[in-house]
Amino acid sequence: MENLNLNKHISGQFNAELENIRTQVLSMGGLVEQQLTDAITAMHNQDSELATRVIEGDSKVNLMEVTIDEACVRIIAKRQPTASDLRLVMAIIKTISELERIGDVADKICRTALEKFSHQHQPLLVSLESLGRHTVQMLHDVLDAFARMDLDEAIRIYREDKKVDKEYEGIVRQLMTHMMEDSRTIPSVLTALFCARSIERIGDRCQNICEFIFYFVKGQDVRHMGGDALEKLLIASDXKKAK
């Protein structure tokens, strides 16, 4: 794993503790990415066995969040980190919360697939698979950016969510047209819309992780900035990089 050039501490154990927590976060991220990938596959292929495995695996994601959270609390209490060390710990705490919620989405997709969908709904699921693959790639990329605290990559991924939003809007229009043409499909279309919205929200979760990377690197909290203000800040960051 790439070293972040963390502050050198008198206690080498402190560095080891921080690196260990980062490693755990990336392990959790890898598990969540696999859970999401499997959930999309299970939904598209109507694979009940795979869907069941994803549902059962959600408890492991939850346990990892609790374990990492407790480790962060111990570091804060024991080491009283400051500056970039404190920002790293806080970014980790917030990131694992987002990862756990993405894991919940994978769980919900599988439960919905088991309870609501059948092979006759396959045409409705094709576009959802495409959206799902897009968000899986976003998650993969943001985990890589988090591993390196790569601000440039985080900015690129942040902007990628606009493409996810447009894809989601297209799916909504398609599903609404399908429903208006055949009222018998209303229940299944509404379920597909619920799944599409849940998948689209993964892009928002990835955006949040990008904001935590920005916070660690720049020391600035951008979570509640308006879209225009944040875009100006990102453009300014791009301009500094180009100089």
Swiss-Prot record:
GO biological process, one term: negative regulation of phosphate transmembrane transport
Record InterPro entries: P_transport_PhoU, PhoU-like_sf, PhoU_dom
Cellular location(s): Cytoplasm
SUPFAM superfamilies: PhoU-like
Main location: cytoplasm
Keyword terms of this UniProt record: Cytoplasm, Phosphate transport, Transport
Domain of life: Bacteria
Single Gene Ontology MF annotation: protein homodimerization activity
Pfam families tied to this protein: PhoU
Quaternary assembly: Homodimer.
Function statement: Part of the phosphate (Pho) regulon, which plays a key role in phosphate homeostasis. Encoded together with proteins of the phosphate-specific transport (Pst) system in the polycistronic pstSCAB-phoU operon. PhoU is essential for the repression of the Pho regulon at high phosphate conditions. In this role, it may bind, possibly as a chaperone, to PhoR, PhoB or a PhoR-PhoB complex to promote dephosphorylation of phospho-PhoB, or inhibit formation of the PhoR-PhoB transitory complex.
Family under the similarity heading: Belongs to the PhoU family.
Protein name: Phosphate-specific transport system accessory protein PhoU
